[in-house]
A protein has these predicted regions:
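Extracytoplasmic/secreted proteins, especially bacterial periplasmic and envelope-associated proteins
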Residues: 67, 71, 136, 144, ...
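Active-site neighborhood of HAD-like aspartate-dependent phosphohydrolases
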Residues: 101-103, 112-147, 151, 158
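Second-shell loop/turn segments in exported
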Residues: 54-63, 135-142, 164-170, 201-204
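Non-catalytic pre-domain segments flanking phosphatase-related domains
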Residues: 17-106, 277-298
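C-terminal cap/substrate-recognition subdomain and adjoining C-terminal extension
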Residues: 174-298
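Substrate-recognition element of Asp-dependent hydrolases with the DxDx(T/V) motif
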Residues: 110, 149-181, 193-195, 231
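Bacterial N-terminal signal peptides
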Residues: 5-16
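Structural recognition of the beta-strand scaffold that forms the well-ordered cores
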Residues: 103-107, 113-115, 162-167, 193-196, ...
Length: 298
């Protein structure tokens, strides 16, 4: 009897299980979509991250800078010996170089001084470039010399070459810039060797383009070499588009590595604005323009 009762109870239980399987949610039904752990953990993209990490940590950066400055050092004796040698583009050379004292023109930021810490702060704050915060960094006078720059310019100065630092830092930042350069060991005998944006110069208009300041140097000096991380450090850019930049450089390609020496800067520059135009674009608009400029060779 107990066995019969047990069998009956078991049969009802099995029927109940079958009923549940039929009328309930099938165990094999696909679960609701969920966010994968990888997607949950993915950090927000930052256009500056890879470039800044490379600039601060990659040995290759220092090797490139040192290569450029050593190549310039090898060309310097010939440039000094040839009294007709001049590195100013034709639109900036307003007179004869005969009898002029020798000089070298260098940009400051990311050419002789390393400002990557200011970009690190920008990344950690989740912020875009800000002139006020940039001014704070400049006032701290903490920028370090880039590889090879100090040795080359110091040696050039010992050979009687005046170094002019033509920078697009604001003229109000001249004192901090001079102090930073001197504390880093660069040859700055006179404050007049630092020509910031807005410096009062007679005879030419002052703007972000450096042509006016190059002309001013050229009045009294024969410019042996120019150094920079932007095309505008060498020649005036009439049309800041990728094609416009190539066009303005085309007549001077033979000077590259001989009179003009370019340094790498993946952090910022007119190369970036050339992709999207004015600086009033939002970060999203700038990223869209950058992605559109990419070529996957398909």
């Amino acid at each position: 009897m107990r066995n019969a009762a047990l069998a009956t109870a078991l049969s009802f239980a099995l029927v109940g299980c079958v009923s549940t399987r039929i009328h309930g949610t099938p165990p094999s039904a696909a679960p609701a979509p969920t966010t994968t752990p990888a997607a949950q953990d993915a950090p927000p993209a930052d256009d500056m991250l890879n470039a800044t990490v490379w600039y601060q940590t990659a040995l290759e950066r220092d090797l490139v800078y040192r290569t450029v400055y050593r190549a310039a050092a090898q060309r310097l004796p010939a440039a000094l010996a040839d009294k007709t040698w001049d590195a100013l583009p034709k639109e900036d050379r307003t007179g004869s170089v005969k009898g002029l004292k020798p000089a070298i023109i260098v940009d400051v930021d990311e050419t002789v001084l390393d400002n990557a810490p200011s970009t690190v702060r920008q990344i950690r704050d989740g912020a875009d470039f800000d002139n006020k915060e940039w001014g704070v960094w400049v006032s701290e006078r903490k920028a370090k010399p880039l590889a090879g720059a100090l040795e080359f310019l110091g040696d050039a100065a010992k050979q009687g070459v005046t170094v002019f630092y033509v920078t697009n830092r604001d003229v109000e930042q001249t004192a901090d810039t001079v102090a930073n350069l001197r504390s880093a060991g660069f040859p700055v005998a006179s404050d007049e060797q630092v020509l910031a944006r807005g410096t009062a110069l007679g005879g030419c208009a002052q703007n972000k383009e450096k042509s006016c300041r190059r002309q001013w140097v050229g009045r009294t000096h024969r410019v042996l070499m120019q150094f920079g991380d932007q095309v505008g450090d060498f020649v005036r850019i009439a049309e800041n588009t990728p094609d416009g930049r190539r066009k303005v450089m085309a007549p001077y390609m033979d000077w590259v590595g001989e009179r003009w020496f370019a340094l790498p800067n993946p952090l910022y520059g007119s190369w970036e604005a050339a992709l999207y135009g004015k600086d009033d674009k939002t970060p999203a608009q700038r990223r869209t323009a950058k992605e559109a400029a990419l070529d996957d060779a398909k």
